[in-house]
Amino acid sequence: MRLAVGALLVCAVLGLCLAVPDKTVRWCAVSEHEATKCQSFRDHMKSVIPSDGPSVACVKKASYLDCIRAIAANEADAVTLDAGLVYDAYLAPNNLKPVVAEFYGSKEDPQTFYYAVAVVKKDSGFQMNQLRGKKSCHTGLGRSAGWNIPIGLLYCDLPEPRKPLEKAVANFFSGSCAPCADGTDFPQLCQLCPGCGCSTLNQYFGYSGAFKCLKDGAGDVAFVKHSTIFENLANKADRDQYELLCLDNTRKPVDEYKDCHLAQVPSHTVVARSMGGKEDLIWELLNQAQEHFGKDKSKEFQLFSSPHGKDLLFKDSAHGFLKVPPRMDAKMYLGYEYVTAIRNLREGTCPEAPTDECKPVKWCALSHHERLKCDEWSVNSVGKIECVSAETTEDCIAKIMNGEADAMSLDGGFVYIAGKCGLVPVLAENYNKSDNCEDTPEAGYFAIAVVKKSASDLTWDNLKGKKSCHTAVGRTAGWNIPMGLLYNKINHCRFDEFFSEGCAPGSKKDSSLCKLCMGSGLNLCEPNNKEGYYGYTGAFRCLVEKGDVAFVKHQTVPQNTGGKNPDPWAKNLNEKDYELLCLDGTRKPVEEYANCHLARAPNHAVVTRKDKEACVHKILRQQQHLFGSNVTDCSGNFCLFRSETKDLLFRDDTVCLAKLHDRNTYEKYLGEEYVKAVGNLRKCSTSSLLEACTFRRP
């Protein structure tokens, strides 16, 4: 008896015996009407969800900020917020993250974001950096697309003092219509719409009103959302009389808003704690809720309806929910432009404008060796280059997206991911010596499959069950091209079953494609130089020491044989001991790569954000003139294209960084065939970053 009581006490204290996981989502409501709807939500979910399923509890607070604090303190679990409040929720000490997004439109084409744009008449002739002295049309004071975003981005161009903000804006434009502004204190903000009425009684109020202000000729520019012009002008010929102002001081047609906008603004979003936030449970609850009580599902209770108010718990105009990818934090979800605009307004900080003197370029380095080289570059550049570290290439891309870093050079596979994340190529590594290297369009390189000559029975057609060596998951020659070709043959993504073993850095640690890797401890199979079989040289070493086939570039074998690589594993290797697999089932000597390869691949390219494009281009061209291939003695001087190990920051065989001319988007740079091939392989992608970026830019 005493033992039994003791056991029960242990169970009670530790909570370990037959523990039932807490499947309750505590929803935060900010008014009596919201609390009433929350209780109805709770009761109706009980009637349709099994007893072991998710349930709702309601927590009432006085404001959204109180809800944010309650969730951070684990007194509540979820609340739906607009974009501005998502920014507040993300800031320390709250540290909340978006977990579920409302969508609008159809299930087939769900809209989770809108674009804030600056619309002008086609014949007006000015650019974004020439708005001073123009007449402006705004949806309303304090509204996202019509005020916060454009004024936030223009903040540093406003005349000082910038407080009060309304006065600075009034002095920047020659006249405005900013509904809801104080016309007595700031008459210039009401010059185009006398009275500045804060309702539809003011003909220039709201999205359609701001566009009408432009259309009528009262203003020169209207700050609205991307759909406004389509909602007000059904005829394409009429829409063609208008253009969008882009942040890089160019213009684009109104239907190119995805590539020419002030910011991408997310829809209303459910937020939760970043750690222990029940995000999967919240999604399970809301997914089941929309199945039972979504649009046109039930007359008893409707998630997206507010009989006793407007937009209670969720927006009445929402059509459903989408799960936010787990890789996406609030900064990525809101986007660099939006975060910059809001931070400028709240903190009075200024972004780097394209017309400013270029600030240092923050280069993203992977691994200890890359950081050492980057630091040496930084010292030699006399402050033109600064260094930022990240564990993986995808982490670097994310840092560039959110402004923590500015640039890095990427393999074509990662140029694709970076492009999907909104980054742009700015210069290409060129590996061919010529009299005018910087102006010579790069020709690309060949992706090849290398085997040992002694394995004479091995061909492209009988690779199943063999041991494979890859540069890294997601890279061009080592993964995208060979796996894309294999996918077309086997019609599934289980490459870890196709090969018996392999080393494909970036694979899941328990995958057979990590079994051949040589990294120790946590560095095993990591997609950086801490894994000895990472990259071109690493994949070839994997073949030399353990594998049957290596997927690399055509220069890899000659660069690591004949004594060119002095490392102990490579110094005695002979190029003649290796052969290439051809797609027709034959084999050829290594030097015949032009007639025996898997595909031609795009050269590595430097990527950056659109707002840094001009500065990165300018500074890198200066840097290569100082430290490029014209430096002959690298023993006593810093050389940009030489490495203590292999291919640090840039490929070691880079001759120069070449201009892209008109190939300044990832699609144009990579080419239609490569983009299509990588797109087909996306269904096999394990890239959490690609998933997140595709959510933002479908």
Curated annotation (Swiss-Prot):
Per UniProt, the keywords (alphabetical) are: Disease variant, Disulfide bond, Glycoprotein, Ion transport, Iron, Iron transport, Metal-binding, Methylation, Phosphoprotein, Repeat, Secreted, Signal, Transport
Example GO molecular function term? ferric iron binding
Positions bound to hydrogencarbonate 2: 471, 475, 477-478
Q: Which GO terms describe its biological process?
A: antibacterial humoral response; cellular response to iron ion; intracellular iron ion homeostasis; iron ion transport; multicellular organismal-level iron ion homeostasis; osteoclast differentiation; positive regulation of proteasomal ubiquitin-dependent protein catabolic process; positive regulation of receptor-mediated endocytosis
**Effect recorded for residue 589 to S:** In allele TF*C2
Q: Which family does it belong to?
A: Belongs to the transferrin family.
Question: Which residues are in the Transferrin-like domain?
Answer: 25-347, 361-683
- Supply the source organism for this entry: Homo sapiens
Disulfide bridge positions per record: 28-67, 38-58, 137-213, 156-350, 177-193, 180-198, 190-196, 246-260, 358-615, 364-396, 374-387, 421-693, 437-656, 469-542, 493-684, 503-517, 514-525, 582-596, 634-639
Q: What is the lineage of its organism?
A: Eukaryota, Metazoa, Chordata, Craniata, Vertebrata
Database matches in Gene3D superfamilies: Periplasmic binding protein-like II
Disease linked to the protein: Atransferrinemia: A rare autosomal recessive disorder characterized by abnormal synthesis of transferrin leading to iron overload and microcytic hypochromic anemia.
Q: What is this protein called?
A: Serotransferrin
Point out residues bearing the modification Phosphoserine.
389, 685
| Location within or outside the cell | Secreted
Q: What is the superkingdom listed in this entry's lineage?
A: Eukaryota
What PANTHER family does its record include?
Answer: SEROTRANSFERRIN (PTHR11485:SF31), TRANSFERRIN (PTHR11485)
Q: Give the residues the record marks as binding hydrogencarbonate 1.
A: 139, 143, 145-146
List the carbohydrate attachment sites: 51, 432, 491, 630
Q: Which residues carry this modification: Dimethylated arginine?
A: 42
